[in-house]
Amino acid sequence: MKALEKDKYIIFLDIDGTVFDGTGVPERTAKALARAKAAGHKIFLNTGRADCIVTKEIRDAVDPDGVVSAMGTAIFVGEECIYSAYMSKEDAQFLVSFGEEQGVFVIIESIEKLVSMNGPAFLGQENFLDKAEDLFTKYPEMNVSKVSFMQTLAEEALAVLRERFVGVYAHSGYVEVPTGDCNKATAISRVCEYYGVGIDRAIAMGDSGNDLDMVKFAGIGVAMGNATADIKAAADLDALL
């Protein structure tokens, strides 16, 4: 356990739509985060992205103390992985086969790599799967932490997933299924425990979708200026970095 200085906070930041605007991390955002770090606060990225696609550009601009990736399924403090969770092969195979049946673009995620099925390479990850049944034949070493379906699923399909999985996060245009009970809020709890502080010392900043859990859970939830209505309703504060 590491100590956090008295009266300092752990700031958890979504990436896409929060610190990353689609082209990069704005200079004013990077400067604001640098000031927060200089004042003794801890900065954590808390993202739905797998660790392998949290780019060097983003890491260099934010200079985080840690990274929570793939909706809380992996937590790094510096270079140390303090928590990781993976699906059973049965659950991963079920999800990939389900995506194949639905005829949708599927992304299979681990800390080290992404694998695409029924779609193109994603963010430079050139790993592909032609048939769901070949997942663990082609990638026997893969520890799957999250599976994403890259289009909207019908309510009937979502109901099938929710019968088997605790967290099924349906957004506009994609659906995420992380392992177990992992989400951005459970990650905040684990990081706060690591530093020996309560969640009242956590600030969570987000804009949409899978940020809702952490914005509601943290001691202080902050909605970005571009946030969706549900995030703004759940937040304690509105802000624009």
Language-model regions, residue ranges each:
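Asp-based phosphoryl-transfer active-site loop
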Residues: D7-T23, V215
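Active-site metal-binding loops of divalent metal-dependent hydrolases
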Residues: G17, R49, G206-S208
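Short, acidic loop-to-helix structural element flanking the phosphoryl-transfer center
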Residues: D21-H41, M87-D91, F128-L129, D181-E193, ...
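Active-site phosphate-binding/coordination module
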Residues: E27-F122
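Hydrophobic/aromatic beta-strand patches that form the interior of the parallel beta-sheet core
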Residues: F44, V68, I203-M205, V222, ...
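Structural recognition of alpha->loop->beta junctions
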Residues: D60-G78, L129-D134, Y139-N143, K232-L237
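Conserved acidic, metal-coordinating active-site core of Asp-based
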Residues: F98, Q102-M214, N226
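Asp-based, Mg2+/Mn2+-dependent phosphohydrolase catalytic module
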Residues: F217, G221-L241
